[in-house]
Amino acid sequence: MKKASRSVGSVPKVSAISKTQTAEKIKPENSSSASTGGKLVKPGTAASLSKTKSSDDLLAGMAGGVTVTNGVKGKKSTCPSAAPSASAPAMTTVENKSKISTGTASSTKRSTSTGNKESSSTRERLRERTRLNQSKKLPSAGQGANDMALAKRSRSRTATECDVRMSKSKSDNQISDRAALEAKVKDLLTLAKTKDVEILHLRNELRDMRAQLGINEDHSEGDEKSEKETIMAHQPTDVESTLLQLQEQNTAIREELNQLKNENRMLKDRLNALGFSLEQRLDNSEKLFGYQSLSPEITPGNQSDGGGTLTSSVEGSAPGSVEDLLSQDENTLMDHQHSNSMDNLDSECSEVYQPLTSSDDALDAPSSSESEGIPSIERSRKGSSGNASEVSVACLTERIHQMEENQHSTSEELQATLQELADLQQITQELNSENERLGEEKVILMESLCQQSDKLEHFSRQIEYFRSLLDEHHISYVIDEDVKSGRYMELEQRYMDLAENARFEREQLLGVQQHLSNTLKMAEQDNKEAQEMIGALKERSHHMERIIESEQKGKAALAATLEEYKATVASDQIEMNRLKAQLENEKQKVAELYSIHNSGDKSDIQDLLESVRLDKEKAETLASSLQEDLAHTRNDANRLQDAIAKVEDEYRAFQEEAKKQIEDLNMTLEKLRSDLDEKETERSDMKETIFELEDEVEQHRAVKLHDNLIISDLENTVKKLQDQKHDMEREIKTLHRRLREESAEWRQFQADLQTAVVIANDIKSEAQEEIGDLKRRLHEAQEKNEKLTKELEEIKSRKQEEERGRVYNYMNAVERDLAALRQGMGLSRRSSTSSEPTPTVKTLIKSFDSASQVPNPAAAAIPRTPLSPSPMKTPPAAAVSPMQRHSISGPISTSKPLTALSDKRPNYGEIPVQEHLLRTSSASRPASLPRVPAMESAKTLSVSRRSSEEVKRDISAQEGASPASLMAMGTTSPQLSLSSSPTASVTPTTRSRIREERKDPLSALAREYGGSKRNALLKWCQKKTEGYQNIDITNFSSSWNDGLAFCALLHTYLPAHIPYQELNSQDKRRNFMLAFQAAESVGIKSTLDINEMVRTERPDWQNVMLYVTAIYKYFET
């Protein structure tokens, strides 16, 4: 029997040794558990050596306990292998090392299960043989009683076997449920490292316990107490594994709640960003959505260690914008789950980085199946987590800096866009009021035209009546009547044309006004819808917060339940320790019984056996109660697992709903963008239409006959200047020729002197005196030449300034007259004392009334041509040197203001026409006109030509005026009254653009570059500073904080003032001082404080933009 037991026990020993070796290879940390297992084996071996026989009761109880132990362990050994096999199809990318480790684990599991089955079958056969031998050895006297006891024991054994089978089925169900729950928890959580370590720990414990049980059973056959001790030792292990699972579930619930909190925070951030973009980006369609996001790729580092994943994804991501907030939910959540599985340093980095991913591109993270399938890789990441965390912190710092720059640029551009939108709204309101006023004037004009047409019809009937009377009385009427009737016909035709044009323009303006009102209503409706959408999103956010609060309450309840279970397990552990002590006592008693039995006192043995049976029954009842408590504990664990599954389902549904809402919001945002683009194009079209209509209205009111005089005057001036230039050139040529002749004479004279130097010393002295005289005359001639050149330049500059002043004053007078015309404030066309006739609606009506009633005056009014001098802008500073710029800006700064010059303007009505023409023709014209667009200058010249024709016509009319030709003068007087206003000398497009550029110099720049004024000025600065080193202008705050941008911009115009190659970005104060001094040297006043610019990293972008606008206005307009 000993040989058989040894041979049978050798198989579990080998398997146990191989299992412990593989366990040590997989996880060296579990050596402590193996050592404790060895300690447990020694007392069992000693007990087996001291005991050779046992009673049938102890053998029956031991057999039942062994069956339970083997069944439970067999099922538990299959459970850990089933969970990875269920999760294995979900893995997509696993390295070869992980595959090898999982393969070895599965092979060891299979060998363990087969070894356990074989050992259990051999133990059953050995127990049967021992029972038969012991029944034969019993004495024949007590055989009857023993047979009765055997029958009872067999019945009790069958009952215990039924109980064991039931407990087996229950334990099998519980183990299968636990395996399913473990698979679910693994699928939900990405904490692969923790789960893997715990699974390996449990496997090593199972192997150690199986090795201990095999050794104890093989070396002590029939040792019921040692096997019962093994059962009692196994039950706390099962409870401890259950508690470990509960703790894991609790941590998983905490992590899920943290994820929900982070997701709620992300949703709030996205709502704020979305509301901000909807409210403040109505006029900027090409803006903050232009930042492109590079697609991050999974680098090899994310398979070798977890820290590399964070580093590679930070390096692979690009700067984002507010659009990326609405499209990267899933990746952000996966990244958050993956970062929670790192150690403390990496988890801190991930907590720092997580809110960054909610406002920019979401980082690419490995999937849950990949992170589950790599336990060995997760273990290897500890070594590289420190380096990866340092790299991650550096990358995060750089990323935070980039995102701050993008955020400040975006806010700056949004504020500039809002300001421009407010300006455009104000301009639109002004244009609407202007259109309304023009419409009212047109209504008045139409009424007056209707009245005049009625009067015309009445007068025509009277004329017919008077003609019929004259024909009846045979009285011949004069030819002047025919002339007068022709004049009335011409007036009638003019009235009809004006009425038709006014009606057509009124219809056009009404259509434009209706279109603008409809567009405004649509914009208000879209704004209202956007506000409603924002309110709905806020309500949804509140609902999500309430859900999270309820989840937190559930989590607190689960934590309390877990504490209760811990307390229960602690009490059970205390009870088990007490039972172990009792078991030791019982072992001692059994040893005493064996000794007494050997001595031969059987009566005492019977009493002791009865007491032992009673103690055994008590111990069995206590064990059954403990098993019931264990069953209750497992049921509670199942309920907790169900609650966790429900929470997970709710979380998945909530996540899907959030994704759908985000997609809907993205679609709504795209629609709003497209609508905004369409409205922007419609708005620009409307502006162009308004400008064109305004031009047409002004052109219909202006008379186009003022161009020839200005052109002829300019041609005469150019001819005179050319003649003067030729005269000066002839004088210079004569002086040069005289100089050459004198120098030739001097050389000849010197040659003669050299030949006769010995003979004529006295002639030499005379010649030297003549040489001195000639040099003095030459110097005087040169000085005279220089004086003449300077006088010529002064005359030219004076004439240019005078001519520019006349043109500038003329433009101002034109605008004043236009304002007077619009306000309806003017004097009558027929007034002989008026020197500045401005035809308005009322004056036209009065002129039409007086044309048919009052005789014409003796002299017609001479139209005014304001040509008084005014200050003119200097040429661009880039075209002259700094010294010349100072000399030019001197007299201009001391010039009189425009109003004073316009008040001192002479009254050309009091000057004779011949003197006026002589003064105009003799006045010099500049060689180059001021810097205005070519089209505007051409229009000004054409208008001036028409004004000259009007003046000539007025002169001829004044000279040829007589009482006999008053009717002819009356015929042309409406044309004169309409054409005599200086308003006609400038086209409305030119006037509106000049007015707009004087008010806002960035409007032309915005038309040139497109987009908003801020972006246009930014592009202009980038174009000007292109090619300069260390210059990157992306905004008007941080890009200008070192002063190099100012220096580069001013260096393009003033290279003599700024030594750009010597500048350094560290010396900010010197850069700002150089730039501001250079700007002040040409008259640009500094509006920025040097100390504030040096101190702050982000100066006020509005102040910087105003200063750059002043630079652009000075040098480019």
UniProtKB/Swiss-Prot annotation:
UniProt xrefs under Gene3D superfamilies: Calponin-like domain
Illness the protein is tied to: Facial clefting, oblique, 1: A rare form of facial clefting. A facial cleft is any of the fissures between the embryonic prominences that normally unite to form the face.
Family statement drawn from the similarity comment of this UniProt entry: Belongs to the cytospin-A family.
Alphabetized Pfam families for the sequence: CH
Keyword Cell membrane: no
Predominant location: cytoplasm
GO cellular component, one term: cytoplasm
Summary of the function given for this chain in its UniProt record: Involved in cytokinesis and spindle organization. May play a role in actin cytoskeleton organization and microtubule stabilization and hence required for proper cell adhesion and migration.
Protein name: Cytospin-A
InterPro entries, sorted: CH_dom (IPR001715), CH_dom_sf (IPR036872), F-actin_Monoox_Mical (IPR050540)
GO biological process: actin cytoskeleton organization; adherens junction organization; anterior neural tube closure; cell adhesion; cell division; cell migration; negative regulation of actin filament depolymerization; negative regulation of microtubule depolymerization
Listed Basic and acidic residues bias regions: 120-131, 158-171, 946-956
Origin species: Homo sapiens
SUPFAM superfamilies in the cross-refs: Calponin-homology domain, CH-domain
Outcome of swapping residue 190 to M: No effect on the stabilization of microtubules
